[in-house]
Each structure stands twice: as C-alpha cells, then as structure tokens.
C-alpha cells in the first residue's frame, strides 16, 4: 500500500476512496439537524489533520475509539464548505501486534531510539571515573522505557517521539567536538563530567511530562508543575547515589550541572554554572534547542523569505538565505 499514513493520500487519491492508518486526535458524539447521531473525529498523521465522520454507527461503537490512539480506516473523500473531510466507511483500532510505522503518523526523531540510547550508554561505559559511570548508567537503565519514547518538551524544541534522546545525543556529539578543542587548551577540563551532565541533564523530563504510548506530551504532570525537571533530576541523582554509595563530591558536581543547565534563575536554574564543565553543558543545551527551533521555523519558508515572529526566540523573524 506504499506509505501507510492516510491524510497524505487525500490530495493524491486516484479515486474518492482512501485507506490507511492515522491518529485519533479527538472524537465526540454529535447530532445533525435531523437528530441523527454520528461520531465526529479529528484524525491526524505526520501530514496534518482532517475532519472525519462516522454515520450509522452501532451503539456499542460509542466509547470504542479514544484520543491519542492509532486506528485504521477506509473512507470516502467529501467536500464540505470547500474543505475536504472524510466519511468513514470502515474503522477499527490497531491490533497490539500490528506493524505500524509511527514516523508516518506523528513527528518522530530521525534516528532509531534504541540506537540513540545505546550511544549514550556506551559513552558512559567508557568513563574512567567509576562513580560517574555507575550513576549515569544506573539512571539510564532505571528510566530506559520512558527515555526511549519521551519528547524533550511539551511544545517547542524536540517535542516529538524520541525527542529527548534526539536532543541529548545531538548535544553529546557537539560536546565531544567542543571538548576536543578546549581539552588541549585547558588540560584539567573533565570531559567525563561534561558528558555525564549532558546525558542526564533532562532525564527527569520522564517525570515532568504526561506522555502516552504515542510518545507525545499532553500536559505537565503534577510533580512537573510543582517541582520541575531540574529539581526532580537532582533528586534522581540523590537516590541513585544513595543506592550505589557513590562519592559525595562527585555526586554534588553532577547535581550542580543539572541544577545550573538553564543558566539563570529566570529560566529555572537557582544557581548559574560555577565551573567550566557546567558552563559547557548549559551553553550546548541553549545552542541545540535554539538551532532546532530556528530550522523548524524556517522549514516552510521560501529562500529569500522571512518566518513569522518566533516568541521562543525573543520574538525574532528569521531569514532563509539559501546558502549551503
């Protein structure tokens, strides 16, 4: 059937029939002017979203379909007030063992989550500092299931399935390049501290965000609202250190890097970076998040054009220059 997602087929359909997989963004029972009941869906995939209606449904179907789940539908394309929408002819929930490429349905990181996770774990495996190695690998193992699918944010940078790993592995690659330069100038720079700080800096996002099986965040958790991932990350390190009986000073340095990675109090860090490794972690975090947001904002802009103002980037308009 080629591409599995449904909505990309609407505009390229050879007939007025389409079939494929999509996400239920919302579903509600409604009635038309004649009193006939129907289920009103908003369906979505990586290509966008579309209104769809299920008429003449059986009473037992009400409650069968839920938001943030994957379904397969066969539908007829109709025009309503010059907008394309779907009349659902057949519909079913996806089976647990059904192979569905989630990258065609929702925004996903461009690399396999298992491979990105292994990149982080192998990096920690090479640490000569046993305490840093144990702390980092322990926290990765304890949170692996969530780390594999969590986004890095509710909105904005890396707010996609696997986005937390994408953000973290990109930062780690950047850190290795930066440390290769500055280690020559400042031999006492601890690359292992930098790498451990980067690997764990956002790990408590797995507790801060409410994320379903699709790997997209829908809200902040109660703890996320009240404590935030910086404080929760420090607590995760504290618990791991107590379990592993790691060196108190090394544990404190790692905690400081998590505490300071947002740089300044107005962005959530109660202390600024107070040693070079913490500064590197903070600066690379800012760089990666801002570059992601800039390229995302420019993705639909023609060469020579300007983006809309980006409030997350100090309300700047961005320019697409065309040079490569």
Which role does the model predict for each range below?
Residues 26-37, 50-103:
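OB-fold single-stranded nucleic acid-binding module
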Residues 156, 166, 181-301:
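Divalent metal-dependent catalytic cores for phosphoryl transfer on phosphate-bearing substrates
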Residues 22, 68, 171, 285:
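Divalent metal-coordination and catalytic microenvironments
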Residues 40-45, 211:
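Short, acidic/hydrophobic/Gly-rich beta-strand patch recurrent on exposed beta strands
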Residues 1-19:
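OB-fold nucleic-acid-binding modules
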Residues 282, 289, 299-300, 304-324:
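N-terminal intrinsically disordered, cationic/polar leader segments
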Residues 99-224:
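Acidic/His-rich, divalent-metal-binding segments that scaffold phosphate/diphosphate chemistry
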């Amino acid at each position: 059937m080629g591409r599995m997602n449904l909505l990309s087929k609407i505009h390229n359909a050879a007939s007025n029939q389409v079939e494929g997989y999509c996400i239920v963004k919302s579903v509600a029972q409604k009635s038309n002017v004649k009193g006939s009941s129907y289920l009103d869906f908003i369906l979505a995939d990586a290509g966008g979203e579309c209104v769809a209606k299920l008429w003449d449904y059986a009473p037992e179907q009400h409650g069968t379909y839920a938001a943030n789940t994957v379904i397969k539908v066969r539908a007829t394309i109709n025009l309503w007030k010059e907008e394309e929408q779907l009349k659902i002819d057949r519909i079913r929930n996806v089976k647990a063992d059904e192979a569905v490429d989630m990258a065609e349905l929702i925004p996903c990181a461009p690399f396999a989550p298992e491979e990105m996770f292994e990149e982080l774990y192998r990096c920690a495996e090479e640490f000569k500092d046993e305490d840093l190695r144990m702390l980092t690998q322990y926290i990765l193992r304890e949170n692996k299931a969530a780390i594999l699918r969590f986004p890095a944010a509710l909105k904005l940078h890396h707010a996609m399935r696997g986005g937390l790993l994408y953000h973290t592995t990109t930062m780690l690659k950047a850190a290795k390049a930066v440390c290769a330069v500055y280690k020559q100038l400042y031999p006492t720079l601890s690359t292992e501290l930098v790498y451990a700080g980067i690997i764990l800096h956002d790990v408590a996002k797995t507790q801060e965000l409410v994320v379903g099986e699709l790997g997209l965040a829908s809200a902040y958790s109660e703890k996320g609202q009240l404590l935030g991932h910086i404080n929760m990350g420090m607590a995760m390190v504290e618990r791991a250190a107590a379990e592993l009986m790691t060196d108190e000073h090394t544990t404190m340095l790692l905690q400081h890097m998590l505490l300071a990675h947002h740089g300044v109090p107005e962005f959530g860090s109660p202390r600024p970076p107070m040693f070079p490794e913490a500064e590197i972690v903070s600066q690379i975090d800012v760089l990666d998040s801002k570059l992601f947001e800039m390229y995302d904002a420019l993705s639909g802009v023609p060469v020579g054009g300007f983006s809309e103002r980006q409030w997350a980037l100090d309300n700047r308009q961005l320019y697409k220059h065309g040079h490569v």
